[in-house]
Amino acid sequence: MIVIFLGPPGAGKGTQGKKIAKKIDLPHIAIGDIFRTIIKTSTSEAELINNYVRQGELIPNEIVNQVIKNFLLSFEYKNGYILDGYPRNLEQAQFFESFIKEKIKIIYFDVSGELLIKRILGRYSCKNCGKIYNRYFLQPKTDNVCDVCGSSTFDYRKDDNEEVIKKRIEVYKTETYPLIDYYKNSGNFYIVNGSKNEQEIAMDIQKILKIN
């Protein structure tokens, strides 16, 4: 089973992707994580990608498509995976379908712009285990101590400022809304209310995927 999580930045795709992937024992592949890993390398590709990220612009299709194809074909995912953040537009979707023949389920996270901004501005994660927190909605139970691993080192994303976030959301709308219309006619497109709390969203996704 291949499941695609669609939604704007801050919609909760990463949080739910990790949660659902663990429950059904499938890999969670997040395009954002892949590119952040590339950016940490000292290569011309990393510098090019980082320039787009800093300006709040989407990385060009030809770069995204090739990175994703190379990544997916370099591993054997016999039982499928959860793909988070790709495809983001119609061209990427058609490219994806050109080399992936398995049946796909698409889940779209519908969230208001105001809530998205708060989620992104407040977001940070444990450097050790990757657990995601939020200054507004989800703090560790003990100040500066990760609930999962006990680490006291956290990572705050440098590209998360309000001006860049608003631009990313607008760019996302322009790029991705035609893709939503495209998938609506596939028979495998589902919408979840991303404004609900984490547990409620997880339950909605489990119903769609028919898992307990």
Swiss-Prot record:
Positions of region (NMP): 30-59
Catalytic activity: AMP + ATP = 2 ADP
Record-annotated disulphide pairs: none
Positions of the UniProt region annotated as LID: 122-160
Residues reported in the UniProt entry to bind ATP: G10, A11, G12, K13, G14, T15, R123, I132, Y133, K196
GO terms for cellular component: cytoplasm
Annotated localization: Cytoplasm
Keywords, alphabetical: ATP-binding, Cytoplasm, Kinase, Metal-binding, Nucleotide biosynthesis, Nucleotide-binding, Transferase, Zinc
Top enzyme class: transferase
GO molecular function: adenylate kinase activity; ATP binding; zinc ion binding
TM region(s), chain numbering: none
Annotated positions binding AMP: R36, E57, L58, I59, G85, Y86, P87, R88, Q92, R157, R168
Record: residues binding Zn(2+): C126, C129, C146, C149
Keyword NADP: no
CDD domains: ADK (cd01428)
Entry-linked InterPro entries: Adenyl_kin_sub, Adenylat/UMP-CMP_kin, Adenylat_kinase_CS, Adenylate_kinase_lid-dom, ADK_active_lid_dom_sf, P-loop_NTPase
Summary of the function given for this chain in its UniProt record: Catalyzes the reversible transfer of the terminal phosphate group between ATP and AMP. Plays an important role in cellular energy homeostasis and in adenine nucleotide metabolism.
Description of its domains: Consists of three domains, a large central CORE domain and two small peripheral domains, NMPbind and LID, which undergo movements during catalysis. The LID domain closes over the site of phosphoryl transfer upon ATP binding. Assembling and dissambling the active center during each catalytic cycle provides an effective means to prevent ATP hydrolysis. Some bacteria have evolved a zinc-coordinating structure that stabilizes the LID domain.
Quaternary structure and interacting proteins, as annotated: Monomer.
Name of the molecule in the record: Adenylate kinase
Organism field: Rickettsia rickettsii (strain Sheila Smith)
Gene this chain is encoded by: adk
